[in-house]
A protein has these predicted regions:
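Core catalytic alpha/beta fold that binds nucleotide/phospho-ligands
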Residues: 1-123
């Protein structure tokens, strides 16, 4: 409910651009000029994407004040439907410098979203 309110409010497009990367915005139908309200499923997906960002920041140990923007950490879906992280900008450099890869699991039900992030050292 909070995500739908944030995205549907008067500053929804600004919020979307600050929080969600291009692939997430496209998947959620948040492109500029699209003023249609978010469906319950899309709002739940947006909440899960946000939870994925929080899970990554916690696993990385940086918190929200970390060295990168939320829109640089994207939760995308593979053709199979499986979620996967896509990093850009500072988050991609941070991952590369540390030789890390991230695994992601998402779930949402009953208005709640849950994400798990596991960071592994590339070998």
């Amino acid at each position: 409910a909070r995500m739908a309110k944030s995205l549907g409010g008067p500053h929804g497009s600004t919020f979307a651009a600050r929080v969600f990367g291009p692939a997430e915005q496209e998947a959620l139908g948040l492109s500029e000029g699209n003023s249609s309200p978010l469906s319950a499923h899309k709002a739940a997906s947006a909440a899960a994407d946000f939870a994925a960002k929080e899970a990554f920041l916690k696993a990385a140990g940086t918190g929200l004040a970390g060295p990168f923007a939320l829109c640089e950490i994207e939760a995308v879906r593979l053709e199979s439907g499986a979620p996967e992280y896509r990093f850009s900008g500072g988050s991609a450099r941070w991952m590369d410098e540390r030789h890390l890869r991230a695994k992601l699991s998402l779930s949402h039900d009953g208005g709640m979203a849950l994400a798990f992030c596991i960071l592994e050292t590339e070998t």
